[in-house]
């Protein structure tokens, strides 16, 4: 699991917001050129069955708070993840995520 805080980073103050504000994230940039995003996803409801996210590069999504179910493109079923667990999505792919509670995450851009 990743540390609860990062040092010596630059933070993009402009959030990436999707699904009418239900999902938001901020990008942090490290001195060595690495990027990560830190985000929050609000619970699904009768208006949103699940969220879909596309990837351009390989991403490791680390759940830091809450729990959710994820179905990566090409998989047949959803898999369960909770705080302390992570999953990998290849580049040029995507995944569906559904949750009944607030989920916090770190997206490690690995590609």
Curated annotation (Swiss-Prot):
The keyword tRNA processing does not apply. GO terms for molecular function: guanosine phosphorylase activity; purine-nucleoside phosphorylase activity; thymidine phosphorylase activity; uridine phosphorylase activity. Keywords: Glycosyltransferase, Transferase. Its EC number is 2.4.2.1, 2.4.2.2. SUPFAM superfamilies: RmlC-like cupins. It is an enzyme of class 2 (transferase). Belongs to the nucleoside phosphorylase PpnP family. This is Pyrimidine/purine nucleoside phosphorylase 1. It comes from Psychrobacter arcticus (strain DSM 17307 / VKM B-2377 / 273-4). The gene is ppnP1.
